[in-house]
Amino acid sequence: MIPLAKPYLTKDEAEAAHDVILTNWVTQGPKVAEFEEKFATYVGSKYAVALSNCTTALHLSMIVAGVGVGDEVICPSMSYIATANSILYVGAKPVFAEVNPRTYNIDVEHAETLITNKTKAILIVHQIGMPADIDAFKGLCKKYNLKLIEDAACAAGSVYKGSKIGSHSDLVCFSFHPRKIITTGDGGMIATSNEEYYTKLKLLRQHGMSINDRVRHDSTKIMFEEHVVMGYNYRMTDIQAAVGVKQLEKLDWIVSERRKIAVQYLEAFKNIESIILPTEEEGYFSNYQSFSIYLKPSCKINRNDLMQVLLDNGISTRRGIMTSHREPAYLDLGFKVDLPISEDAADRSIVIPLYVPMEQYDIEFVIKKIKNLV
């Protein structure tokens, strides 16, 4: 079976985790701090806060941005459900915007039509590693005095207008799930250059505790913690962080290798009239966290049948990006919205295998089977 994705993990990560275990300091210790510092340097932010996953990163971003009960946050429905869920967690309402039909990223013009006096923030998503139009949304947020939050779960290593994703705004949330570009088993990170946010985020991830174990460990005097706000247990372990440090060292190489495979797919499928391929706008650099193709209505096989035939031939695939407003959990909450572009893209897109290292034979086999079927 050719898998859809798999992490690039080697002896380096195993030894790093092993070394941490031998220290007996396995959570919120020096490796977490090292990973945060190196990640911030990599993306170009002043600070980074390591967390248990990207969903918790989104949740805390909502809190520090001041989003709460009665507020509205504009976001795409076409995204993994955690995007919208993070808004509900704080008692606010996700207001679903349409996506751009070329990039499948949130459409700035439609988003502007949804702004009301209840709108508190806009949550943009860099879909499967393709940067959204950050400058356009920064301008929109400035115009209406809104907060901008970036769901960059899939976008580690992606570049927007010459700068890494993570350097453009004050709350940028990353994921280290195994399907992402780099992994810590699971994990998340918030990149920020806002010192006030940074201070609050560190409190919130550890039950609102005024000091952490590392500070107390290094002190020559006894210290007693205070819990100054209601917080959460959203901490990353040092075992995960040690793996993350090693993964981060390989990130640019992994992105380069993924792009080489993406180029092969783009070249192989470029003349097939029945499909639409990913679009990388000028000044945008995708890490190709996933490679998604869209099947036009003229395609001789529908998406679900194509997925089944490929599975029968030993090729794992997934549907394209979901639409949250059509999931049972959101239907039960009464969300009814008309988003024809998002719905059509979700119903007609398919994600095909892409990982590092991927054998050339497997790449060619995937190409051959898809070309024969579509």
Where are these regions (language model features)?
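Short beta-strand->loop structural element characteristic of the AMP-binding/adenylate-forming
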Residues: 93-103, 318
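Hydrophobic residues in well-ordered beta-strands that form the structural core
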Residues: 69, 75, 96, 148-150, ...
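Phosphate-binding glycine-rich loop
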Residues: 25-72, 86-90, 96-98, 163
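Active-site phosphate-binding strand-loop segment of PLP-dependent enzymes
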Residues: 102-184, 189-197, 302, 355
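PLP-dependent aminotransferase class I/II
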Residues: 33-37, 42-49, 109, 121-125, ...
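Conserved coil-to-alpha-helix start sites within the AMP-binding
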Residues: 79-84
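N-terminal "arm"/small-domain region of PLP-dependent enzymes with the aminotransferase-like
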Residues: 1-25, 30, 226-228, 353
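Helix C-cap/helix->beta junction micro-motif
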Residues: 90, 143-144, 313
